[in-house]
Amino acid sequence: MAEHHHTISGLVGKLVTELEVNCNADEYYKIFKHHEDLPNAIPHIYRGVKAVEGDRITSGFIKEWHYIIEGKPLTCKERTTYEDEARTIHHSTVEGVLLDDYKKFDATLVNPKADGHGSIVTWIVEYEKINEDSPVPISYLTFHKIIEDLNTYLCASD
């Protein structure tokens, strides 16, 4: 079951969704760190992803995402950093339509369990709106659907 938290203070906000999964925890971390398989795993959300600056092995590389939110195809470029020890992957948007409404739009995936089955996967979206008219990015809470769909995909390959 997904758990959602939402806080906002003026123009700055944070959205959190957590979901318990029952497949191999390491596979969750790997599929997000080595992102090429995401479009195959969940093509109804991710249409494509590629490294555009640096290589996917080095923390700090930039990748371009093609994805769908609320039925709309979107593209963005993000700088991706990761901490293997903490099993945390951080995406910071550097280009794309998200920056039309937000000065900052960052997404962090936390999957603390290193191996075995079962884990809690957490998505954290932190943002700063350009102005009061910019929407709260509630549609990005649907990332719990990504976690659920990956659970199904990864369990099928266990």
Swiss-Prot record:
Gene3D superfamilies found in the cross-reference section: 3.30.530.20
Cited InterPro entries: Bet_v_I/MLP, MLP-like, START-like_dom_sf
GO cellular component, one term: vacuole
Organism this protein belongs to: Papaver somniferum (Opium poppy)
Localization of this protein: Vacuole; Cytoplasmic vesicle
Tissue specificity as recorded in UniProt: Laticifer.
Function, in words: Not known; MLPs constitute up to 50% of the soluble latex protein.
Originating gene: MLP22
Name of the protein in question: Major latex protein 22
UniProt keyword annotation of Oxidoreductase present: no
Single Gene Ontology BP annotation: defense response
UniProt entry tagged with the keyword RNA-binding: no
